[in-house]
Amino acid sequence: MRPTDLTTPTHFHKVVDCQWACPAHTPVPEYIRLIAAGRYTDAYMINWHSNVFPGILGRTCDRPCEPACRRGRVEEEPVAICRLKRVAADNKEEVLSRMPPVPALKNGKRIACVGAGPASLTVARDLALLGYEVHVYDAEARGGGFMWTQIPRFRLPESVIEEEVGYITGRGGVVTHYNHRVQSLKALLDEGFDAVFVGCGAPRGRELDVPGRQEAAANIHIGIEWLAKVSFGHVERVGKRVIVLGGGNTAMDCCRSARRLGGEDVKVIVRSGFEEMKASPWEKEDAMREGIPILNYLVPKRVLHENGRLTGMVFEKVKAEYDAKGRRNLVPTGEPDVTYDCDDVLVAIGQENAFPWIERDIGLEFDRWGLPKLDPVTLQSTLPNVFFGGDAAFGPKNIIWAVAHGHEAAVSIDLHCRGEDVRDRPDPHVRMASQKMGIHEWSYDNDVSIDLRYKVPHVEERLALRDIRVEVELGYDRELAYKEAQRCLNCDVQTVFNAKLCIECDGCVDICPTDCITFTENGEEDDLRTRLKAPAINRSQDLYVADGLKTGRVMVKDEDVCLHCGLCAERCPTGAWDMQKFYLETAKTYANGARACRS
Amino acid sequence: MSYLKPTLHHPKLPTNALGLTRRDYEGSISTLCAGCGHDSISAAIVQAVWELSIPPHRVAKLSGIGCSSKTPDYFLGASHGFNSVHGRMPSVLTGANLANRELIYLGVSGDGDSASIGLGQFAHLMRRGVNMTYIVENNGVYGLTKGQFSATSDKGSKAKKGAVNTDEPIDLVALALELGATYVARSFSGDKDQLVPLIKGALTHQGVAFIDCISPCVAFNNHEGSTKSYDYVREHNEAVNRLDVFFDRTPITASYAPGEVTEVTQHDGSLLRMRKLHEDHDPTDRVAALNYLARHKAMGEIVTGLLYIDPHPEDLHDHLGTVATPLNRLDDAALCPGSAALEKINAALR
Ligand SMILES: Cc1cc2nc3c(=O)[nH]c(=O)nc-3n(C[C@H](O)[C@H](O)[C@H](O)COP(=O)(O)OP(=O)(O)OC[C@H]3O[C@@H](n4cnc5c(N)ncnc54)[C@H](O)[C@@H]3O)c2cc1C
Ligand SMILES: Cc1ncc(C[n+]2csc(CCOP(=O)(O)OP(=O)(O)O)c2C)c(N)n1
Ligand code: SF4
Ligand code: SF4
Ligand code: SF4
Ligand SMILES: [Mg+2]
């Protein structure tokens, strides 16, 4: 194998699994250490720069970081990265003074953002901090997009949204136009904006098409429309017996909301198997804990109604069968259909994009799925001054993806407004610093905690179900947060090897608790992976290979289950291993790496 | 500084016949200098005992004084241990073995401990054929007392500050062969592929098994001009054979060319298979081994591998005709048979 290329940050960035998996590349271990140190405000600010909505995301993030977390590969569960983020938000002190100031002197450029969801708000923040004048339009009365209209208050209190949206819209540079639905992109462009960002989300709920749907329409609701009405207070009650159709997170929010609005017998019914459901495991758990059964392999067949009133639904029983290509088909089992009586049905079977306000003759092209044609990196559309992000770009995703898109789109818009090539992206900001403090002393806590994941305390269920505004999760207190934070393995503190110093004594090989290090003859990767002290079977994790040893062998480190305990470096007589903190921040328009500071 | 090794381990860490992982055979974290060869030998012992699926409590580890003699704390944390007096491990171990022959005895010593102050004890243990594994972690210096030349230091070898050793070295391997050891090997801490099987073979050997393991002292004897440094040993290492230890009649695989393999079945059924690397070396001939050693030493080579093996050793208990039951399991009547029995013995000696 070729020696690992350390001239680019890729190898070490991938070692920080959580940060690599986070769409916005939040420097997770750094903020977790700050939480352990009680420096909540500092931890909050790291998050704020990276993901803009730490308090919101600390409660609602889809957390792609957690399945990626290294901890989950050396014991049962990953670090509770997401809920630690909330700890920073809950315990922080004043933060406004720490935020970069919005320049009083404007750069003369005007940008329009359609929608006030997380994608648009991120664009607005990043550009306003650079002196742009950003106009944000939303059909609703407040900012936040789906975070406000869809995510129920028992998961995300209004005050948190208000606070974090306020850090963007309330500091100047951003002009909000609420209760203002943009009806024409052409007209908007005609207003002379230097660029337009489209962050209008994926606002249309998929319809249910079965006999009886129209006749019983009064009691059949499209999930996202219903949730929005609940959020606005337009819907305050629901029938006693409720069926929720669908297996995604929207279905979970519908059923749990229904439980709080008078629903006593609420059930979720999905076509596919329980395991295949799109909802996150923790959302399913939360629903089931609230007494909501999830019934699977049932396909809606008919709506039953009497005198225009919904009475129940009929389902066909199916089972999964796999064809020769391994594709799954749902085929009827042949058993009799099942009927469930109900008073209301909530349809949460998917969301679609819709751009009725974008003219099709202005040069902005759509693909055959109705999505805009975009450059996946720059998010630029076929109209060079129109950019997309969030759910509007590639279909429904989640908040953290919307934020990540927002940062990238802001960089693109800034480059575009400067007349530069939007594909020439600024580099991330990277720092490497040795953590050595003494012979065997490190400036990070290298002891490895063996504690299992701590559960986040919940409010008493009786209280939770009484009022839809009561937040279910109480969050970790400081003590629990400290203990959970100690579970983090500090994957950003990298093991950096210097072959010139190595005397091949095997000290590091012998001490490594997880058998990561091998000195051996070089070979092709496939072969090398089988010859290591512990076979490196996890191909998603790279090998760190270094040559230049006296014996002509190579040092091979399987990064997979390294605990970052620093024992290799402690047992190395020559300092050939050093523990160096790798800090990476993606380029933001307003901060390090931005063209503004570089030129 | 870390005082504890995390208990988290590789998720695919294999278990042996007892269901234990290698990590279950470790001891406390080493306090030796980072990079000390002795730590590698500890790791090799852990590996060997784990591979043999020996229950840790069946092992007694004994040592003298020195960095090397400290190491039993760093392996087999669940075994019996006795850290004795400088150079006196052999007599303490002999006593222990006489009292309870059912344990597996592992003596760990240094070149100072065995070739300087303890030379007399070393010699007599070899002569008596105590059933044990005797490992000398040989670094050519008194590491613990800051690097004075020991008796195994080669003539002409330079100390860290430049002093040259003028005395002839003692070759413990030659001495062990001379004195009747029935399993004699030399190895290098930096070559676990060679060392681990040698330790396994020694542990299964039912007589006195001696391993001289060169083990660089990074603090005092790993410089230019030393003949016990990592670089010097790597350059001059001549392995005579590669050993594999089997417990079944695994057929000889294609990786061995015909005629190149010497097989020895030991008393406990273990099969030692040695792949010859040197034509003119026969590991079952004591005199030839001594000659071979002398010839190659004169050529400046450090000969390593299993140099001699007697598959049918006799041990101290065989010589003395002692009772097989450990003393702690004999009752009072058997241990103290009374004055009539004593009278009988005395009469026999008159
Ligand atoms: C029920 C439900 C629960 C969810 N829970 C989570 C969760 O827990 N965690 C998570 O990460 N994600 C969750 N999501 C997904 C998440 O809300 C979205 O992915 C995210 O909000 C997308 O952000 P966005 O900026 O693209 O647009 P959105 O948040 O969808 O905002 C778009 C905004 O644009 C406005 N708009 C649309 N068209 C126009 C127009 N023509 N003129 C003016 N304004 C317009 C809309 O009113 C809306 O406010 C959930 C989604 C749903 C439906
Ligand atoms: C009776 C006695 N004499 C001297 C000493 C001092 N002493 C301690 S260790 C040692 C030498 C150890 O050398 P070696 O056995 O080679 O061990 P190493 O430290 O090199 O591994 C000496 C002389 C002692 N502890 N006891
Ligand atoms: S252990 Fe910590 S640094 Fe490592 S992946 Fe998990 S959260 Fe990130
Ligand atoms: S401990 Fe240091 S000198 Fe020894 S093998 Fe490892 S890296 Fe090389
Ligand atoms: S002094 Fe030498 S023998 Fe002792 S621990 Fe240090 S390196 Fe090892
Ligand atoms: Mg010594």
Can you say where each PLM-predicted feature lies in the sequence?
Chain B
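Conserved active-site and cofactor/substrate-binding residues in soluble primary-metabolism enzymes
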Residues: 39-44, 56, 87, 91, ...
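Short catalytic-loop micro-motif centered on adjacent basic/acidic residues
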Residues: 34, 107-109, 183-188
